[in-house]
Regions:
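The feature primarily captures lumenal catalytic ectodomains
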Residues: 1-330, 342, 350-351, 357-408
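Short coil-to-beta-strand transition motifs
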Residues: 334-343
Length: 408
Protein backbone atom coordinates (compact mmCIF):
# COMPACT_ATOMS: atom_id res chain seq x y z
CA UNK A 1 0.00 0.00 0.00
CA UNK A 2 1.35 3.43 -0.91
CA UNK A 3 2.51 5.86 1.77
CA UNK A 4 1.39 9.47 1.50
CA UNK A 5 3.12 12.50 2.98
CA UNK A 6 1.37 14.02 5.98
CA UNK A 7 1.11 17.39 4.25
CA UNK A 8 -0.94 15.93 1.40
CA UNK A 9 -3.18 13.70 3.49
CA UNK A 10 -6.78 14.69 4.17
CA UNK A 11 -6.09 18.21 2.89
CA UNK A 12 -9.65 19.43 3.44
CA UNK A 13 -9.17 19.01 7.19
CA UNK A 14 -5.80 20.79 7.46
CA UNK A 15 -5.66 23.72 9.89
CA UNK A 16 -3.02 26.34 9.05
CA UNK A 17 -1.40 27.87 12.16
CA UNK A 18 1.48 29.76 10.54
CA UNK A 19 1.41 31.07 6.99
CA UNK A 20 5.14 30.94 6.25
CA UNK A 21 7.19 29.13 3.63
CA UNK A 22 7.38 26.18 6.04
CA UNK A 23 3.68 26.34 6.84
CA UNK A 24 2.69 24.92 10.23
CA UNK A 25 -0.35 22.69 9.95
CA UNK A 26 -2.53 20.43 12.03
CA UNK A 27 -4.05 17.49 10.16
CA UNK A 28 -7.26 15.96 11.50
CA UNK A 29 -7.69 12.22 10.90
CA UNK A 30 -10.63 9.98 11.73
CA UNK A 31 -10.84 6.34 12.83
CA UNK A 32 -7.08 5.82 12.78
CA UNK A 33 -4.92 2.80 13.55
CA UNK A 34 -1.15 2.91 14.10
CA UNK A 35 0.81 0.47 11.96
CA UNK A 36 4.14 -0.06 10.15
CA UNK A 37 7.20 -2.13 11.10
CA UNK A 38 6.34 -1.01 14.60
CA UNK A 39 4.55 1.98 16.12
CA UNK A 40 7.73 3.62 17.39
CA UNK A 41 9.59 6.56 15.84
CA UNK A 42 10.50 6.66 12.95
CA UNK A 43 8.58 3.58 11.75
CA UNK A 44 5.02 4.41 12.76
CA UNK A 45 2.51 4.82 9.94
CA UNK A 46 -1.13 5.89 10.18
CA UNK A 47 -4.14 4.36 8.44
CA UNK A 48 -7.62 5.87 8.32
CA UNK A 49 -10.23 3.17 7.92
CA UNK A 50 -11.89 5.08 5.08
CA UNK A 51 -8.79 5.46 2.87
CA UNK A 52 -6.74 3.18 0.63
CA UNK A 53 -3.33 4.61 1.56
CA UNK A 54 -1.06 4.96 4.57
CA UNK A 55 0.21 8.24 6.03
CA UNK A 56 3.79 9.00 7.03
CA UNK A 57 3.32 11.28 10.09
CA UNK A 58 6.95 12.47 10.09
CA UNK A 59 7.32 15.84 8.40
CA UNK A 60 11.10 15.77 8.68
CA UNK A 61 14.43 14.75 7.21
CA UNK A 62 16.99 12.59 9.04
CA UNK A 63 20.08 14.63 8.23
CA UNK A 64 22.75 12.02 8.98
CA UNK A 65 21.06 9.43 6.74
CA UNK A 66 19.48 11.86 4.23
CA UNK A 67 16.08 10.19 4.48
CA UNK A 68 12.53 11.54 4.49
CA UNK A 69 10.89 8.14 4.82
CA UNK A 70 12.13 4.83 6.21
CA UNK A 71 10.11 2.73 3.77
CA UNK A 72 11.57 1.79 0.40
CA UNK A 73 9.69 3.35 -2.52
CA UNK A 74 7.12 4.78 -0.06
CA UNK A 75 5.29 1.46 0.07
CA UNK A 76 4.38 -0.86 2.94
CA UNK A 77 2.52 -4.18 2.95
CA UNK A 78 -0.30 -3.18 5.28
CA UNK A 79 -2.04 -6.08 7.01
CA UNK A 80 -5.21 -5.12 8.90
CA UNK A 81 -5.46 -6.34 12.49
CA UNK A 82 -8.37 -6.41 14.89
CA UNK A 83 -8.69 -3.06 16.66
CA UNK A 84 -10.81 -1.66 19.44
CA UNK A 85 -12.51 1.72 18.84
CA UNK A 86 -11.32 4.41 21.26
CA UNK A 87 -13.48 7.51 21.58
CA UNK A 88 -12.18 11.03 22.05
CA UNK A 89 -9.54 13.33 20.65
CA UNK A 90 -5.83 12.45 20.60
CA UNK A 91 -2.70 14.30 19.53
CA UNK A 92 0.03 12.23 17.85
CA UNK A 93 3.39 12.59 19.61
CA UNK A 94 5.34 9.48 18.59
CA UNK A 95 8.50 11.40 17.75
CA UNK A 96 12.17 11.22 18.68
CA UNK A 97 12.29 11.00 22.47
CA UNK A 98 15.64 9.18 22.62
CA UNK A 99 18.11 11.74 21.29
CA UNK A 100 18.26 14.76 23.61
CA UNK A 101 18.90 17.37 20.93
CA UNK A 102 16.13 16.11 18.67
CA UNK A 103 13.72 15.84 21.60
CA UNK A 104 14.39 19.44 22.67
CA UNK A 105 14.79 21.00 19.22
CA UNK A 106 12.47 18.99 16.96
CA UNK A 107 9.95 17.16 19.14
CA UNK A 108 8.97 19.65 21.84
CA UNK A 109 7.98 22.49 19.46
CA UNK A 110 5.18 20.32 18.05
CA UNK A 111 3.45 20.84 21.38
CA UNK A 112 2.55 24.28 20.05
CA UNK A 113 -0.21 22.63 18.00
CA UNK A 114 -1.28 20.62 21.06
CA UNK A 115 -1.69 23.77 23.16
CA UNK A 116 -3.69 25.41 20.38
CA UNK A 117 -5.98 22.40 20.05
CA UNK A 118 -6.62 22.32 23.80
CA UNK A 119 -8.40 25.66 23.44
CA UNK A 120 -11.07 23.88 21.40
CA UNK A 121 -10.67 20.33 22.72
CA UNK A 122 -9.86 20.68 26.45
CA UNK A 123 -9.89 16.91 26.97
CA UNK A 124 -7.49 16.08 24.13
CA UNK A 125 -4.85 13.51 25.11
CA UNK A 126 -1.19 13.32 24.10
CA UNK A 127 -0.42 9.99 22.40
CA UNK A 128 3.23 8.97 22.80
CA UNK A 129 5.58 5.98 22.69
CA UNK A 130 9.23 5.22 23.32
CA UNK A 131 11.70 5.35 20.43
CA UNK A 132 12.18 1.59 20.13
CA UNK A 133 10.16 -1.58 20.89
CA UNK A 134 12.84 -2.74 23.34
CA UNK A 135 12.57 0.44 25.42
CA UNK A 136 9.76 0.23 27.95
CA UNK A 137 10.37 3.53 29.75
CA UNK A 138 11.36 7.06 28.82
CA UNK A 139 14.59 8.74 29.81
CA UNK A 140 14.01 10.93 32.89
CA UNK A 141 14.37 14.13 30.86
CA UNK A 142 11.31 13.23 28.78
CA UNK A 143 8.91 12.65 31.67
CA UNK A 144 10.36 15.59 33.62
CA UNK A 145 10.01 18.00 30.70
CA UNK A 146 6.41 17.00 30.01
CA UNK A 147 5.69 17.45 33.72
CA UNK A 148 7.19 20.97 33.68
CA UNK A 149 5.02 21.74 30.65
CA UNK A 150 1.94 20.41 32.42
CA UNK A 151 1.31 17.75 29.79
CA UNK A 152 0.00 14.30 30.71
CA UNK A 153 0.08 11.49 28.18
CA UNK A 154 -1.15 8.02 27.28
CA UNK A 155 0.90 5.31 25.59
CA UNK A 156 0.00 4.53 22.00
CA UNK A 157 -0.74 0.96 20.93
CA UNK A 158 -1.42 -0.88 17.69
CA UNK A 159 -4.70 -2.49 18.70
CA UNK A 160 -6.72 0.71 19.11
CA UNK A 161 -8.69 2.63 16.51
CA UNK A 162 -8.57 6.28 17.54
CA UNK A 163 -11.78 8.16 16.79
CA UNK A 164 -10.04 11.49 16.18
CA UNK A 165 -6.28 11.88 15.81
CA UNK A 166 -4.62 15.23 15.21
CA UNK A 167 -1.11 15.29 13.72
CA UNK A 168 1.06 18.39 13.59
CA UNK A 169 3.67 19.25 10.98
CA UNK A 170 7.21 20.11 12.04
CA UNK A 171 8.21 23.56 13.26
CA UNK A 172 11.90 22.83 12.60
CA UNK A 173 11.86 20.60 9.49
CA UNK A 174 8.91 20.89 7.11
CA UNK A 175 11.11 21.02 4.01
CA UNK A 176 13.41 23.62 5.57
CA UNK A 177 15.53 21.58 7.97
CA UNK A 178 18.62 23.75 7.55
CA UNK A 179 16.81 27.04 8.10
CA UNK A 180 15.78 28.80 11.29
CA UNK A 181 12.89 27.23 13.19
CA UNK A 182 9.40 28.66 13.20
CA UNK A 183 8.96 31.56 15.60
CA UNK A 184 6.17 29.50 17.17
CA UNK A 185 8.79 27.06 18.51
CA UNK A 186 10.24 29.67 20.85
CA UNK A 187 6.96 29.95 22.74
CA UNK A 188 7.28 26.28 23.71
CA UNK A 189 10.94 26.57 24.72
CA UNK A 190 10.10 29.54 26.94
CA UNK A 191 7.55 27.39 28.76
CA UNK A 192 10.31 24.88 29.59
CA UNK A 193 12.17 27.12 32.01
CA UNK A 194 11.20 26.14 35.55
CA UNK A 195 10.53 28.53 38.39
CA UNK A 196 13.18 27.23 40.80
CA UNK A 197 16.19 29.32 41.75
CA UNK A 198 19.65 27.85 41.34
CA UNK A 199 22.90 28.37 43.19
CA UNK A 200 24.88 26.74 40.39
CA UNK A 201 27.86 28.26 38.58
CA UNK A 202 27.35 31.11 36.13
CA UNK A 203 30.41 30.15 34.07
CA UNK A 204 30.63 26.48 33.19
CA UNK A 205 31.85 23.81 30.79
CA UNK A 206 29.46 21.10 29.60
CA UNK A 207 31.46 17.94 30.13
CA UNK A 208 31.31 14.83 27.96
CA UNK A 209 33.45 12.84 30.42
CA UNK A 210 30.59 10.48 31.28
CA UNK A 211 33.13 7.81 32.30
CA UNK A 212 33.89 9.90 35.41
CA UNK A 213 30.53 8.97 36.96
CA UNK A 214 29.13 6.20 34.72
CA UNK A 215 25.54 7.41 35.05
CA UNK A 216 24.05 7.69 31.57
CA UNK A 217 20.38 6.85 32.07
CA UNK A 218 19.37 10.52 31.76
CA UNK A 219 21.45 11.12 28.65
CA UNK A 220 19.30 9.59 25.93
CA UNK A 221 21.33 8.59 22.89
CA UNK A 222 24.85 8.37 24.31
CA UNK A 223 27.67 9.35 21.95
CA UNK A 224 30.12 10.43 24.65
CA UNK A 225 32.12 7.20 24.35
CA UNK A 226 32.04 7.30 20.54
CA UNK A 227 32.39 10.95 19.54
CA UNK A 228 34.88 11.13 22.38
CA UNK A 229 37.34 13.91 23.09
CA UNK A 230 40.49 11.90 23.75
CA UNK A 231 42.19 14.71 25.68
CA UNK A 232 39.16 16.15 27.47
CA UNK A 233 41.01 15.98 30.80
CA UNK A 234 43.38 18.63 29.45
CA UNK A 235 40.44 20.70 28.20
CA UNK A 236 38.88 20.71 31.67
CA UNK A 237 42.20 21.57 33.32
CA UNK A 238 42.77 24.57 31.05
CA UNK A 239 39.24 25.91 31.51
CA UNK A 240 39.49 25.64 35.29
CA UNK A 241 42.33 28.18 35.13
CA UNK A 242 39.72 30.69 33.96
CA UNK A 243 37.22 29.90 36.70
CA UNK A 244 35.05 27.82 34.37
CA UNK A 245 33.40 24.97 36.29
CA UNK A 246 32.86 21.50 34.80
CA UNK A 247 29.22 20.36 34.93
CA UNK A 248 27.45 17.17 33.83
CA UNK A 249 24.01 18.01 32.45
CA UNK A 250 22.96 14.35 32.64
CA UNK A 251 23.27 14.50 36.45
CA UNK A 252 20.85 17.42 36.71
CA UNK A 253 17.09 17.27 36.78
CA UNK A 254 15.40 19.01 33.87
CA UNK A 255 14.24 21.83 36.12
CA UNK A 256 17.76 22.31 37.50
CA UNK A 257 19.20 22.25 33.99
CA UNK A 258 16.86 24.82 32.47
CA UNK A 259 17.29 27.09 35.50
CA UNK A 260 21.10 26.83 35.29
CA UNK A 261 21.21 27.77 31.61
CA UNK A 262 18.68 30.56 32.06
CA UNK A 263 21.14 32.27 34.45
CA UNK A 264 24.37 31.41 32.60
CA UNK A 265 26.92 34.13 31.89
CA UNK A 266 29.44 31.94 30.01
CA UNK A 267 28.96 28.46 28.56
CA UNK A 268 31.71 26.40 26.91
CA UNK A 269 31.05 23.01 25.39
CA UNK A 270 31.66 20.53 22.60
CA UNK A 271 28.89 20.60 20.02
CA UNK A 272 26.24 18.07 20.99
CA UNK A 273 23.12 17.58 23.08
CA UNK A 274 24.37 19.49 26.10
CA UNK A 275 24.95 22.65 24.09
CA UNK A 276 21.36 22.79 22.80
CA UNK A 277 20.36 23.76 26.35
CA UNK A 278 21.44 27.24 25.27
CA UNK A 279 17.87 27.45 23.99
CA UNK A 280 17.05 28.25 27.61
CA UNK A 281 19.73 30.96 27.89
CA UNK A 282 19.22 34.69 27.32
CA UNK A 283 20.81 36.70 24.52
CA UNK A 284 23.39 38.09 26.96
CA UNK A 285 24.97 34.68 27.58
CA UNK A 286 28.44 34.28 26.08
CA UNK A 287 29.02 30.85 24.56
CA UNK A 288 31.94 29.02 22.98
CA UNK A 289 31.07 25.97 20.89
CA UNK A 290 33.91 23.54 20.19
CA UNK A 291 33.09 22.04 16.81
CA UNK A 292 34.14 18.50 15.89
CA UNK A 293 35.18 17.18 12.46
CA UNK A 294 32.33 17.10 9.92
CA UNK A 295 29.61 17.42 12.59
CA UNK A 296 28.35 20.78 11.39
CA UNK A 297 28.63 19.70 7.75
CA UNK A 298 25.77 17.28 8.41
CA UNK A 299 24.10 19.01 11.34
CA UNK A 300 24.45 22.67 10.42
CA UNK A 301 20.94 23.23 11.76
CA UNK A 302 22.29 22.67 15.28
CA UNK A 303 23.51 26.27 15.25
CA UNK A 304 19.96 27.56 15.57
CA UNK A 305 19.84 26.25 19.13
CA UNK A 306 22.80 28.48 20.06
CA UNK A 307 23.05 31.52 17.80
CA UNK A 308 20.66 33.71 19.76
CA UNK A 309 23.45 33.95 22.39
CA UNK A 310 26.81 35.72 22.00
CA UNK A 311 28.23 32.68 20.24
CA UNK A 312 31.79 32.01 19.08
CA UNK A 313 33.07 28.80 17.49
CA UNK A 314 36.37 27.04 18.12
CA UNK A 315 37.47 24.80 15.23
CA UNK A 316 40.28 23.27 17.27
CA UNK A 317 39.68 19.54 16.81
CA UNK A 318 40.89 16.74 14.55
CA UNK A 319 40.20 13.02 14.27
CA UNK A 320 42.52 10.61 16.06
CA UNK A 321 41.97 7.63 13.74
CA UNK A 322 43.61 6.94 10.37
CA UNK A 323 41.66 4.03 8.86
CA UNK A 324 39.69 4.57 5.63
CA UNK A 325 36.42 4.22 7.54
CA UNK A 326 36.85 5.76 10.96
CA UNK A 327 35.61 4.22 14.17
CA UNK A 328 31.88 4.94 14.62
CA UNK A 329 31.49 6.38 11.14
CA UNK A 330 28.48 5.21 9.14
CA UNK A 331 28.88 3.01 6.11
CA UNK A 332 26.73 1.36 3.49
CA UNK A 333 27.22 -2.24 2.41
CA UNK A 334 27.93 -2.37 -1.35
CA UNK A 335 29.40 -5.86 -1.65
CA UNK A 336 27.26 -8.72 -2.91
CA UNK A 337 25.64 -10.21 0.17
CA UNK A 338 22.28 -10.39 1.89
CA UNK A 339 23.18 -7.11 3.60
CA UNK A 340 23.75 -5.09 0.43
CA UNK A 341 22.28 -1.60 0.73
CA UNK A 342 22.04 -1.61 4.51
CA UNK A 343 23.58 1.15 6.61
CA UNK A 344 25.63 0.49 9.71
CA UNK A 345 28.09 2.00 12.15
CA UNK A 346 31.73 0.90 12.36
CA UNK A 347 32.48 -0.65 15.76
CA UNK A 348 35.96 -2.01 15.07
CA UNK A 349 38.73 -1.41 12.52
CA UNK A 350 41.07 -4.37 13.10
CA UNK A 351 41.03 -7.49 10.88
CA UNK A 352 38.36 -5.98 8.66
CA UNK A 353 35.56 -3.62 9.68
CA UNK A 354 33.16 -4.70 12.40
CA UNK A 355 29.82 -3.04 11.66
CA UNK A 356 26.54 -2.77 13.58
CA UNK A 357 23.84 -3.01 10.91
CA UNK A 358 20.50 -1.26 11.00
CA UNK A 359 17.42 -3.01 9.64
CA UNK A 360 16.32 0.38 8.27
CA UNK A 361 14.19 0.97 11.35
CA UNK A 362 16.18 3.50 13.37
CA UNK A 363 17.14 7.13 12.88
CA UNK A 364 20.38 6.73 14.80
CA UNK A 365 22.63 4.12 16.35
CA UNK A 366 21.89 4.26 20.05
CA UNK A 367 24.13 1.77 21.84
CA UNK A 368 21.22 0.23 23.74
CA UNK A 369 19.21 -0.62 20.61
CA UNK A 370 19.86 -4.27 19.66
CA UNK A 371 21.48 -4.65 16.23
CA UNK A 372 23.32 -7.44 14.46
CA UNK A 373 27.10 -7.17 14.08
CA UNK A 374 29.06 -8.36 11.03
CA UNK A 375 32.62 -8.12 9.70
CA UNK A 376 33.25 -6.73 6.20
CA UNK A 377 36.25 -6.12 4.00
CA UNK A 378 37.08 -2.55 3.02
CA UNK A 379 35.96 -3.06 -0.59
CA UNK A 380 32.50 -4.16 0.59
CA UNK A 381 31.73 -0.77 2.13
CA UNK A 382 31.27 2.86 1.15
CA UNK A 383 31.18 5.88 3.43
CA UNK A 384 27.89 7.46 4.44
CA UNK A 385 29.68 10.07 6.53
CA UNK A 386 33.31 11.06 7.09
CA UNK A 387 33.32 10.50 10.83
CA UNK A 388 30.95 13.01 12.37
CA UNK A 389 30.70 10.70 15.42
CA UNK A 390 34.33 9.52 15.49
CA UNK A 391 36.88 10.13 18.30
CA UNK A 392 38.86 13.37 18.16
CA UNK A 393 41.26 15.52 20.13
CA UNK A 394 41.42 19.25 20.89
CA UNK A 395 44.30 21.59 20.18
CA UNK A 396 44.48 23.12 23.67
CA UNK A 397 46.56 26.12 22.57
CA UNK A 398 44.05 27.07 19.88
CA UNK A 399 41.10 26.48 22.21
CA UNK A 400 42.62 28.75 24.86
CA UNK A 401 43.25 31.43 22.24
CA UNK A 402 39.61 31.25 21.09
CA UNK A 403 38.44 31.48 24.69
CA UNK A 404 40.54 34.59 25.31
CA UNK A 405 38.98 36.29 22.27
CA UNK A 406 35.52 35.63 23.67
CA UNK A 407 36.49 36.99 27.08
CA UNK A 408 38.02 40.22 25.71
Amino acid sequence: MRIASLRYANMSSNLLLEDSKRGVLVVKLNDVVLTGRNIHYPNCLLKEQSTDYLINPYDERVMSLMKNCFYDNDVWDFVPVASQPVAGEYFFFNYNVDNYFHFIYDTLPILYQFYELKKTYPDIKLLIQTSHPTKKTFSPFVAEMLDILGVSYVLADDCSEYETLFVGTSLTHGGYSNEAPSELAFSVWKRCIGSISTEGPRKFYISRRSWVHGKTENMGTNYTMRRKCENEDAVVSMLENYGIVEIFTELLSTEEKTALFSKAELVVGIVGGGMCNLLFSPAETKSLCITTPYFMDINNRFRFSMEHTQLNYSDCTKHTGNSKFLLYSRVRVIGDSEHKGKIGEVEGVENGYTVRLSSNDVAGFSQDFPMDVYVFNEEDLEAVDLGLNSPFECDIVQLESDLKKLLE
